């Protein structure tokens, strides 16, 4: 399955081109001919991955708002989750996903598509989504304050990840959106000012702190973010 291609792991891959090539290997060499490639059609990189899968002799199940296999027709926010209206083949399904955020809906659709491609019925796959528990540290609700404010923890450590989380929480905010974040040391330095700008644009209050500086001077990392 393919979800997205964003600026991440460049400390390992070096460039986005190399990172993209590594993801394409899923369909070039690992998924065999005749199997189903489940692809997020809402990703900008979808055309390239779809072309690779077709060239490798695989069947495509595209998912998402633009999906032709498993389509997201509607998404309604709930206090701690979302109600999804999905279409698969000729039927529509209402699914209550107990996870917040548009990106969680994308994750869920790819997961459901993989289950269906693996032999489960749509009903079985969607029933599983309704009882799913989020991964620890992935938009995890960890508490609430006496005045109604809620606290979430997320692993976001890239510009895209931070932007995705802040946009996911924004519809639920009744007062101020406050973000506390940092950047790891000895990793991709180019993402630091990007994350700072995203926090400034999308949150009312941004608090920059230290996040595993490793061999770097913490103050220098904070300065690059700011």
Each language-model region and where it sits:
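Acidic, Mg2+-coordinating active-site environments of NTP-dependent enzymes
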Residues: 1-151, 226
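Histidine-centered active-site/metal-ligand motif
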Residues: 9, 13, 157, 189
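Conserved phosphate/oxyanion-binding catalytic-loop motifs
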Residues: 154
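Active-site beta-alpha connecting loops in nucleotide-dependent enzymes
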Residues: 135-137, 160-226
């Amino acid at each position: 399955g393919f979800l997205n291609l964003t600026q991440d792991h460049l400390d390992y891959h070096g460039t986005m081109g190399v990172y993209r090539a590594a993801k394409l290997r899923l369909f070039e060499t690992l998924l065999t001919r005749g199997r189903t490639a489940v692809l997020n059609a809402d990703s900008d990189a979808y055309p390239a991955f779809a072309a690779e899968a077709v060239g490798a002799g695989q069947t495509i199940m595209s998912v998402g708002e633009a999906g032709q296999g498993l389509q997201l027709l509607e998404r309604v926010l709930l206090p701690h989750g979302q109600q999804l209206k999905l279409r698969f083949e000729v039927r529509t399904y209402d699914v209550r996903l107990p996870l917040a955020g548009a990106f969680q809906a994308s994750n869920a659709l790819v997961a459901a598509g993989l289950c269906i491609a693996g032999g489960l019925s749509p009903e079985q796959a969607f029933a599983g989504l309704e009882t799913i528990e989020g991964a620890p540290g992935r938009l995890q609700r960890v508490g609430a304050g006496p005045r109604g404010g809620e606290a979430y923890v997320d692993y976001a450590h890239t510009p895209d990840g931070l932007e995705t989380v802040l946009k996911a929480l924004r519809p639920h905010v009744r007062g101020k959106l406050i973000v506390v974040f940092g950047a790891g040391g000895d990793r991709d330095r180019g993402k630091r000012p990007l994350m700072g700008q995203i926090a400034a644009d999308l949150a009312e209050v941004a608090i920059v702190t230290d996040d595993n500086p490793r061999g770097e001077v913490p103050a220098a990392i904070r300065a690059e973010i700011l």
